[in-house]
Amino acid sequence: FLRMVVRFLGGNNMSKGLKLSEILVTVLIAVVFAIIYNLWWFAYNVAQVAGVHIEQLTYGVWFMAAIVAYLIIPKPGIALIAEFAAGAGETIVMGKFDIPTIVYAILQGLACEIIFAIFKYKSRSLMVAILAGLATALISFPVDYYYGYLAEVAGWNLLLFIIFRSISGIVIACLLS
C-alpha cells in the first residue's frame, strides 16, 4: 500500500512528486479549514431550524479544503491530503475522534482527486472547480445512507436534500474557493 501511495505522489523522484514545502502548505490550509469547519457547525445548526433541509445549502463549506489546496498547488494527492488533514484536524478541535468525519474527508478528497485527474491536474478553471464541488457533494450521499442519516427522509424531502447539497457543493465549495 505504501509503495502505491509513493508512486501516486510522484515515485522516488521527488521533483515529480510533492515537495515538503507543498505538503506543509497543504497541511497549513487544512488546519485553517479544520477551525473553519468547527465554527461552521453553528451556521449549519441555525439553518437547520428553518427546516426542509435549508442547512444543506451551507454544507459546501466542508468541501472547500481540497479545492482551495488544489487551486494553490495543482498536483496529484494535494486535495486528498488537504481534506483528510482538515477532517482529522476537525476531530482534534472537536476534542473527540470521529470515524464518520474521517470517512467523509477521505471520500471527499478522493472525489476531488478524480475530477482533477480527469483534467490531468492541468486546469484550475471554474468548470473544474464546479465539477469537484459537485463530485464531493455526490460522494457524501452514500456515506450519509450508510450511517443512517437518510433512513427516515421521505422521497420528496430526499430530493430537496440532494439538490440543496449539490447546489452548495457547486456554489459555496467552488465559488468561495
Residue ranges of predicted features:
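Alpha-helical transmembrane segments and their cytosolic interface
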Residues: V5-L28, I35, F161-S177
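Membrane-embedded alpha-helical hairpins and interfacial helices in multi-pass inner-membrane proteins
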Residues: G51, K122-S177
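Hydrophobic transmembrane alpha-helices
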Residues: S15-A69
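Alpha-helical transmembrane segments of multipass membrane proteins
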Residues: I29-Y37, A65-A66, A86, E90, ...
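Helix-loop junctions at the membrane-solvent interface of multi-pass transporters
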Residues: L39, I92-V93, I115-F119, S123, ...
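Interfacial aromatic-anchored transmembrane helix boundaries in multi-pass membrane proteins
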Residues: N45-A47, A86-I114, D144-Y147
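Alpha-helical transmembrane segments of integral membrane proteins
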Residues: L20-I29, T58, W62, G77-A82, ...
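Membrane-helix interface "capping/anchor" motifs
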Residues: Y70-I81, I118-M127
